Amino acid sequence: MKIFLICILALSTAFGNLKAQTATLLNGAWEFNEGEKLHHLFFQDGFYFHTVQQGNQFIGTDGGHYEVKDKSIITKALFDSIDSTGVDNIKEIPFSVTSTQLSLSVPQGEANFQRVDNGQAELAGIWRITGRMQDGKITAIHQTGTRQTYKLLTGTKFQWVAIDPAKKQFSGTGGGSYTFKDGKYTENIEFFSRDNSRVGASLSFDGKLENGDWHHSGLSSKGAKIYEIWSRVGKAN
């Protein structure tokens, strides 16, 4: 009986480790070409963001929380720019993943994503804006109601979203690739929901990590001076 229990515990531990390894394999940025459409799929710290663009044209985005269960990804949407009734919906998506490819079994068929990065970087994670410099003083930002602004960063990709899950409301998003080196944070915009003409633009900021928070300052896309503080969001699962 003792040996049997030890075997069960060993199998349970091994299964738990395999699940964790699979979830870690999902982390990062993935891309899938569907004809002229490009799908971006980001997994980081229990959150997922999925965006579709065609050339410079933004098509749509959705995202929320996820977890791995057996051979499926279980998602719960926080936002959906195309169909707001999809918010709060739970989906179970069968998948397989290797170090370079992610295959998802979706109603339209098999979607084979190629890895862009593995989600490893100093800034990789989910962030929410918590402070802003005003009149020379840093003022805490307390987002009212259920409005939320998130920024997800993988190893090389970023995306921000402005949403209100309680109202199933989507206000905007933008994303692309980024670099963070020698105190300089640079974004290269690849999609932007509010203005396609922003695609191809680059924005550079002075950036630093201080007490776990991310400080960055410079000029916004509209040319206004900004100094923002972003704080990490705890893992969703």
Task: Name what the model sees in each region.
Residues 4-13:
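Sec-dependent N-terminal signal peptides
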Residues 15-173, 184-237:
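Lipid interaction determinants
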Residues 175-181:
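Beta-propeller blade signature
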